[in-house]
Every structure is written in C-alpha cells, then in structure tokens.
Amino acid sequence: DFIIVHESGHEWFGNSITTKDVADMWVHEGFTNYSETIFTTCEYGKEAGNDYVIGTRKRIQNDKPIQGPYGVNQEGSGDMYYKGGNLVHTIRQIINNDSSFRMLLRGMNKTFYHQTVTGKQIEEYISKTSGIDFSKVFDQYVRTTQIPVLEYKVKGNKLSYRWTNCVKGFNMPLKINFGGEKWISPTQKWKTLKIKKGNINTFSADRNFYINTKPL
C-alpha cells in the first residue's frame, strides 16, 4: 500500500528534515512522494519505478506553484506531491548516476539531520553536492506552473531545438533518442546538431524528464 511507504518516508523528509516555513512544504512531500518510486524500484525493478512516477503526472494540475508565499502560513499547490516527485526524478536523470544520486539523498539527511531548513538550502545543497547548477530547474518547477517545451525541427541532416515555455536562462540538459541515445543542452536560442538523415517521427525525448515536446 503506497500510503504506508509514503508515511514511512516522512521519517526522513518532514520529520528528520523539516522546513522552517510551510511555503517550502514541497521539500517534505516531493521527496517523500519519490520514496514510493524508490520502493517500487527496489521491489520490481527500475522500469517499474519509472512507470510509477511517470504515471502520477496525470494527477498534476499546475494550478499554482508548489512553493507558497513566505511568512503567511500558506502552502503551495497540492502538486507538491506528484510534481515534486517528478522534479526529483528529473534531477536524478540529469545527475545520470544512481550511486551519486543515492549518496546525495543520504548526505542530505546527514547534513540536515534533525534540523529545520529552507527550500533554498536544499536547492543549494543539491547543486553543490552534484556539481550541477540546478538553480534554473528549481526556478522552473518549484516557482512556476509552466512545463518546459522542447521545440524541434529536422531539415536534411540537421536537428534544431530550443526550450520554450520556460524561465529566462533555462538550460536543462536532456537525453534524446534519434538514431541512438544522445545528450543535448538546449537553451532558449536555437541550437543545431548534425545527424544522419532520418524521419522526424523517430525523434523522442527521454520520458523520464518531466517536459513536453513540440515538432515544428
């Protein structure tokens, strides 16, 4: 039963690590929601875990940001559960090393053991520990309701792509499949990649990233 796993997960996020303001409650619920995915992965395998977290996206409403306003005792959107879990899953993909991701979670719980923290402290810890600047990723998924859109087009042997529907400076790397797996680093400006000639319909973005795609 997922609720048993979820509430057990709060021993780490929401009990051991607790936010100073309920505006940052996404830290409690996002990471605890993701404990359900970790449990599913341990019991049934990685693809089952991926299926689980991706399956929760249909419950995300994007009605308001998952970070609430500070100093007024107000939470963010209830999306903090499923969107928060998908944010953590996306971060895991970008780190691209499950051992490092596991060490990050354990290190976070050692560093902030039995403390009250801010969401910003958690964000900065993840960036510093991973060696990857996640600031724009957090700005996008925590403080807006927009889901990034990767626009792309193929002409001859060139694939062009860019991010839209995103915060200024959004530069999240992305794994794609177009005649094989590749990593690209889109920005809001068009970039071009030389490829073998192929049908645009064979292009796909890795489903584990919480994004939308739009062929042009």
PLM regions and their residue ranges:
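Zinc-dependent metallopeptidase catalytic helix centered on the HExxH motif
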Residues: 1-50
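Active-site-adjacent structural elements in folded domains
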Residues: 67-76, 109
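Edge beta-strands of extracellular beta-sandwich domains
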Residues: 206-216
